[in-house]
């Protein structure tokens, strides 16, 4: 969170045997939702992991909570603020609820079981390549993923594409 102008929508809670600190971090050139897992001794939080749940360009203002099943759930705004003049009828929506976990020292996120029936394996906006994929967006820079893909799931809702790579190891939320 270094070199940030400010942080919005902070959340701090116990998640499993760790504590979770989240915030939307605003830097000069980006707005990202960031996560820290670590320990809390009652007065000091010591982060053990820092990262982002979603690598896409359009995820912000995440809200994290524990549900009645004990899952750590994240719902974020997919804002589209850069496109307000481009598509005036909307400037985003909320993401699907995702269960987030710290697994093998890495943050993962995957749609909660209640919405998994919406998942598909392909979408016209997603172009598979030999070593990843790209997501075409109307007149704007494409989103590109390079890496091994063992599993790829997609949820599309209108102009929103949420892509889950390798069981949620990488996530891309994109306003098309």
What are these regions (language model features)?
Residues 15, 25-42, 56-59:
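Acidic, glycine-rich loop-and-beta core segments that form the ion-binding/anion-interacting portion
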Residues 1-2, 9-13, 17-27, 71-83:
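Hydrophobic core segments of beta-strands in well-ordered, beta-rich domains
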Residues 39-60, 65-176:
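Beta-rich accessory regions
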Residues 2-7, 55-58:
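Short glycine-/Asp-/Thr-/Trp-enriched loop segments that recur within the blades
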